[in-house]
Regions:
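Extended, histidine- and acidic-residue-enriched regions that form the cofactor-binding/catalytic faces
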Residues: 1-40, 48-193
């Protein structure tokens, strides 16, 4: 579990890889899949810092007409449900991620510390947070929150996490089915007009 995370480097234990190294590694192993006849790949991703880099790799592979690779993030597949379930969601360490882990790996969540995490973080995070005159003024998570947490984790439960997991799984299955139904040539870049 390592990705493009320099924006979290101020928090103990954060490990990250240089963006170019990450892209080259992902591209290399994806090309290996192509060697074995696989022509479609879904990168199942759970880290916002990886999104643009996975998409860049997908673009390179598609432009080379090697294979079609797309990035999928579980919470982006179910935004309405996430919005419905949580009053104060957040993009990092918030209730959606906490609830999902409470469902999948409850032993990793310290329920007795959720209020502390919330209180040391930023409960409300919106389009105006960390912006001045339309420009993002932050580069690192610590610029907005002392502990890296955004949202109110005390709203998380394993039951909510199960709802999110089941809904996201349905979306991933539907994406796999859609991708399998596509003609490979229709997934490639179109000719110049």
């Amino acid at each position: 579990n390592i990705g493009v995370s320099p924006h979290h480097r101020q928090f103990h234990g954060t490990m990250w890889v240089d963006p170019a190294t990450f892209r080259d590694y992902v591209e290399s192993f994806t090309r290996n899949l192509s060697y074995h006849g696989i022509d479609r790949v879904i990168y199942v991703n759970a880290h916002g810092g990886n999104v643009e880099h996975l998409r860049e790799v997908g673009r390179r592979l598609r432009d080379d007409e090697e294979l079609y690779a797309i990035e999928w993030m579980w919470n982006e597949s179910i935004p309405e449900l996430v919005e419905e379930v949580f009053e104060h969601n957040g993009p990092h360490g918030g209730p959606k991620e906490t609830a999902l882990i409470q469902h999948l790996r409850p032993e990793l969540v310290h329920d007795d510390r959720l209020a502390e995490a919330r209180d040391g973080g930023l409960t409300r995070f919106d389009a105006e947070t960390g912006r001045q005159h339309g420009a993002r003024t932050f580069y690192d998570a610590i610029d907005n929150t002392d502990n890296g947490v955004l949202g109110d984790q005390t709203d998380a439960t394993a039951a909510k996490g199960e709802r999110l997991f089941d809904a996201a799984t349905e979306q991933l299955v539907a994406l796999c089915e859609w991708l399998g139904d596509q003609q490979f040539t229709e997934l490639l870049p179109r000719d110049h007009v």
